[in-house]
Amino acid sequence: MDARFDGRTVLVAGLGVSGRAAAQVLADRGAHVVTFDDRAPEADHRDVAAFLAGDGLAEVDLVVASPGLPPHHPLLAAARERGVPAWSEVELAWQVRVPRDGGGGEAAPWLAVTGTNGKTTTVGMLESILRAAGRRAPAVGNVGTPVVLAAVDPQVDVLAVELSSFQLHLTHSMSPQAAAVLNVAPDHLDWHGSLEAYAADKGRIFERTQVACVYNAADPLTAELVREADVVDGAVAVGFTLGTPAVGQVGLVDDVLVDRGFARLRHTHAAELGTLADLAQLAGPDGAVPPHVVRNALAAAALALAHGVDPVHVRDGLRAFAPGAHRIVTVGRVDGVAYVDDSKATNAHAAAASLAAFGEASVVWVAGGLAKGATFDELVRARRDRLRGVVLIGVDRAPLRDALARHAPDVPVIEVAAGETEPVMTRAVQEARRLAAGAPAGVPVTVLLAPASASMDQFASYAARGDAFAAAVRALGADGVSPRDDGPEATP
């Protein structure tokens, strides 16, 4: 039992994976758990209006809320009005941590990652580096495994924690050993209400950081979030850059990843962490490692170094890292055209990074879905030179169509609407093949699924969307499917 929870009534709002885990951990600690979920038949309460009208919060001591509940949700608004504290599952995890075996009574430290894009890849790289160093280090959080289950496992040495802005919003006391914000670009504005609110929630990850705040030297907003954070005395800021690093940064010298943030002689020397060849398994169809992948590797390296990992283990971990599905994966080739699945590119920032990996006028772009209030002018303006043609899918085709008309009027655009005989993705891939066939002989062409939008309008998840793309490519008679496509990961 835990005196903080024993006999207390805790409302767990949302019975997804993290909500169920929270309910289990709370019950194990003696709490009286009440559940709410308007889509789960087993929930104690499903109608928020009826629950609140019946004064359902009267006996509630704490709300543990799913990341799916926005701040303006009636349940959270009512809890604020009554003064009932609300936590995320991540906050609960921090509160219930247990001492790790062999840790001298200390709980496992957390290495935390957030950002608009690249979180899952970076946390996966970090996990691989930590395991190469002999640490028992699960990747947890938004990547799939609830943080709260790892927090109560004494067999864990260190946690590689992926956190979304949703999770951070109701996280109040977490004190990570090191934390990183990879980038900040407009996303989930329907949930947060504004870019400023979204960025502020991302920045919460740096609060109370103990050793190092890792930021993107090419993204001034991430550096600003470090400056605004209240950290533990002695914590340092470490930037990552694709250029030659200054003191206090990790970066790239020719094809070598180097450290000038933690190395003992960093004022005069850089310590080698690995080379781009150690990331060869992440190369795109042209054989080059995409810039955003290198940034992710540098961020993961910085977090691992903050934990005390040796540079040789950074190299070994990056070499061993196996990328997840739906992240710039070549799923087949038809008539010399590569078909690449980057269904995980669920916003404009991610799609821009994906398109940047390809050459001029070489991409037939399959895009569209649920826009979440986003605009696409900046994306199209920045990447129009990559486009040979565009196939639009999804319910929110209009914002992309209009941006293309304004900034890339010469690029042919085909729209595929739902409700016809064949599945949307089958027709999209067929149209993309026709556009690709118009390229001059000898010109390399890639059909790229990088939707810049969420998937839930027409697919169960970004993974289901990517699977549908791969299936449609196979139906064309693709002559090879990438062995990297090893199954879907958790939703972002």
Feature locations, PLM:
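Residue-level signal for inorganic ion chemistry
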Residues: 14, 26, 63, 113, ...
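Phosphate-binding loop of NTP-binding sites
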Residues: 27, 54-58, 67-236, 430, ...
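NAD(P)-binding Rossmann-fold cofactor-contacting core
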Residues: 29-44
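Nucleotide phosphate-binding/pyrophosphate-handling subdomain across enzymes
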Residues: 2-10, 21-29, 279-387, 402
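C-terminal helical cap/extension that packs against the catalytic core
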Residues: 45, 377-445, 484-492
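Glycine-rich, highly charged phosphate/nucleotide-binding loops
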Residues: 43-56
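Beta-strand->loop->alpha-helix junctions that form or flank phosphate-binding loops
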Residues: 37, 87-92, 138-141, 231-252, ...
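Conserved beta-strand positions in the Rossmann-like core of class I SAM-dependent methyltransferases
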Residues: 34, 138, 391
